[in-house]
Amino acid sequence: MNYDNYWDEDKPELNITPLVDVMLVLLAILMVTTPTLTYKEEIALPSGSKTARATQDKMIEIRMDKDAKIYIDSQTYEYNSFPDTFNLLSKKYDKDTRVSIRADKRLTYDKVIYLLKTIKEAGFLKVSLITSP
């Protein structure tokens, strides 16, 4: 009897498919959990002041009624003289101040555009229209 042939035929083969499957699952878990780890690094942040935040929160609200009268706070302005008056008034404010316009829905489109153009010409960059449902 030839023993060499016997052992050659019955050699066990190593099936690596389950091993690869397990390794791929572990790799996927590692890739998902790695970004969630937090690293603690000492970072020296600059100190800020609270006054800078308070000045940014300032806003000018301009209201225009159906008769084209313009209101800023408690002051009333006429439609035709508003550009000159607003240019003088705008010198008190920083040009980065937010300006909100609340116009009556019965106004014509031209009057609201005129108001927007006046505010933009005064140098204000952050102008928005307020609408209500």
UniProtKB/Swiss-Prot annotation:
Pfam families: ExbD. InterPro entries: ExbD (IPR003400). It is a single-pass type II membrane protein. Residues 33-133 are periplasmic. The keyword Glycoprotein does not apply. Residues 1-15 are cytoplasmic. GO terms for molecular function: transmembrane transporter activity. It is found in: Cell inner membrane. Keywords: Cell inner membrane, Cell membrane, Membrane, Protein transport, Transmembrane, Transmembrane helix, Transport. One of its GO terms (cellular component) is plasma membrane. The chain crosses the membrane at residues 16-32. Gene3D superfamilies: 3.30.420.270. GO terms for biological process: protein transport. Belongs to the ExbD/TolR family. This is Putative biopolymer transport protein ExbD-like 1. It comes from Helicobacter pylori (strain ATCC 700392 / 26695) (Campylobacter pylori).
